[in-house]
């Protein structure tokens, strides 16, 4: 699949455009090099696309055999790369995914409904996709957990981030009340006080 991604100018019929800036491309290529020195094996991509020397283009990349402790498995690479490592079982997959300090989104592929619901429940991510990566709905919230951003965009939760909730309590009688001040047991509204309850 990664080899079929058409890369180029976003005004053309392509699947993926360039990274945002030269420094982002340089940073991303360093991330890939570090992943390779830590044991990752390039299965597809791994550099810059042939024929696109001008611009900040990078290959869609798949890395295999990446050790769970590699930096790319624990940091956001912010680039077109899928680092892959083998796990013993579902429990280990959840544990490894959750140990990252980031939690924007997670994708799981399974035909087991119980397993998919457990992943949705246990993955520490703002969004979880099951068998449908990056399927989107503008009525739903977009955002991460941990160090993957603050708040939510889109949906009711996104609108809430533009509101400021305020509590205002007004007593139009404007007479002093003593029930918030010490000694509380002597307050006029305290149950069992001389004045009874109001």
Task: List each language-model region with its residue ranges.
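Short linear capping/connector segments at secondary-structure termini
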Residues: 11-17
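Helical element adjacent to the flavin cofactor pocket in flavoenzyme catalytic cores
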Residues: 31-36
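General beta-strand structural signal in soluble alpha/beta enzymes
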Residues: 42-45, 130-132
């Amino acid at each position: 699949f990664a080899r079929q991604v058409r890369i180029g100018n976003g005004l053309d019929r392509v699947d993926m455009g360039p990274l945002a800036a030269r420094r982002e491309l340089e940073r991303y290529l360093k991330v890939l090099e570090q992943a390779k020195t830590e044991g990752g094996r390039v299965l597809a991509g791994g550099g810059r696309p042939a024929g696109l020397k001008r611009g900040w283009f990078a290959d869609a990349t798949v890395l295999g055999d990446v050790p769970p402790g590699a930096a790319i498995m624990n940091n956001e690479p912010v680039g077109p790369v899928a680092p892959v490592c083998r796990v013993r079982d579902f429990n280990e997959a959840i544990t490894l995914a959750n140990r990252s300090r980031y939690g924007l989104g997670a994708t799981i592929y399974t035909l087991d409904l119980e397993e998919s619901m457990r992943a949705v429940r246990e993955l520490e991510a703002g969004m979880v996709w099951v068998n449908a990566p990056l399927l989107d709905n503008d009525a739903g919230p977009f955002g991460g957990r941990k160090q993957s951003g603050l708040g939510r965009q889109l949906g009711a939760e996104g609108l809430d981030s533009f509101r400021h909730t305020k509590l205002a309590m007004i007593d139009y009688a404007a007479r002093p009340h003593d029930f918030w001040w010490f000694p509380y047991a002597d307050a006029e509204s305290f149950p069992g006080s001389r004045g009874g309850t109001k």
